[in-house]
Structure formats: C-alpha cells, structure tokens
Amino acid sequence: MTDAEWTAVRPLLPVPAWLQGRGGQPEGYCHRQMLDAIRYLVAGGISWRAMPADFPGWGRVYAFFRRWREHGLINEFHDRLRGKVRESEGREAEPTAGIIDAQSVRAAATVPADSRGYDGGKKVPGRKRHIVTDTLGLLLVVAVTAANIGDRDAAAGLLARLRRLHRDITLVWADGGYTGGLVDWCRDKLALTLEIVKRTDDMTGFVVLPRRWVAERTFAWLMNSRRLARDYETLSASSEAVIRWSMVTRMSRRLARPRAAGRH
C-alpha cells in the first residue's frame, strides 16, 4: 500500500491485546507488511505457499489472517474503514438503508463437498455470496453458503444480523428473488421494510434498475480480486474474511485519494 493509504488506515487498526494490558506476547512483525501480504494474495489470487519472498513467511501471514478472522479483528477494521469512507462522502457513519443481493460462484477443489452445492437457476456449482450493502455499495454484512441455498432462506439470518449490528437501518431494497413471506417476516419480526424493486413488463434486455445496481456493482468490485474469481477457501468463514479484505483494499485507496477542492 502507498504511504498515503498507510497514513489513512493506521489509526483504524485494532489494538493488540498486549498493548491494552490484556496479556499476550508483543507481535514480532510489522502490521503494514502483513496487510500488504494479504492484500497481495487477495488481489493476485495466489496460493498461501506462493507468497513472494519480499513478504514475511507464508505461515506467519496465514496465522495473522486466521487470528484476525477468528477474533473478529478483520470485521472491526473493515467496519471502521467503512465509517470513515462514509464520513468522507458527507454521510453519517451508520447507514439507514441497504441493498441485499446474492451471487453464485464456482468452487475450487479445495472447497469441501458439505459446503458447496448447485445453483439450478444460474447453473453454477459452488458457493453463494449473500451481501447487504449501503447506498454507496460498501459492505455491511456478508454470508457465504452452498450455492443451492435459496436467496430467501439465507436472507432471514442475514437481515436479522444486519438489524442487530446496524440499528439505524429501517429500509432494504431487494430483487424479485426475495418476494413472498420474507417481506412480512421482516416487517413483523425485525421492524424492517423490505422493498422489492422489480422489472416491468416493458423492459427488455439489460436494464439498470434503481438501487439494485448498487449491490451488483459491489459484486463487480469483488470480482476484480482474483482470489474471489471463484471460491478457493476451505471454510466459509475464510471466504467471508477474504471478501472483507477485498473491500478493505478498495476503501483504503478511496480514503487516500486527494479530495477535490470544495467537495464535501
């Protein structure tokens, strides 16, 4: 990452336990090196063992990745960055509306059979990424399931988690795959309005639909990271972490960009 990116993200890094007097040994590596190594892996799509010699050993980098995943540190770091990006765009740190969508991707041979499936609608064998973004396309919550899990089935748990983590959100836009009882369930159980954005009968071919395109653009952003071109992770939790790392890179660059004069 550039010096400008490091300056932007360094104050947002989670504080190690030993610095807070909660025990543990001082970390024997530079956080910037570790972040660079993981960003390189996610962007380039390399395997862990193919980590270049310029970075710390692949075992140490993977241990860092695993520790941040297991202790929720990547979630914490990602969410702090998102809040800063929103504020830089003149928004409140916490959003009030979101967009839900799902994407099926092929799975590599490293993905266990019990966590993969076949999406009959998209004709894709593998896993499915379920996301909710804010109106800027920034990730709020993510869940990775087998591809045969229906959008509505995964949405209930995803939206419940969204409501728990982001109490200000009262409106979520969705496509026609989320119709049915889910709309009433969200209203009655979560006090959340799920608004379905549908195509009209006079629409033919590719049409950019209001609101829905935001989440679709986020999926396009993710696919720019070669590690996410298909799912290579053994654990679904690792897939979710890689998605967050991809967004961390995008948000870091966004924060480091020079702001136009007079822009708020």
Task: Label each region the model flagged.
Residues 1-264:
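Short alpha-helical elements
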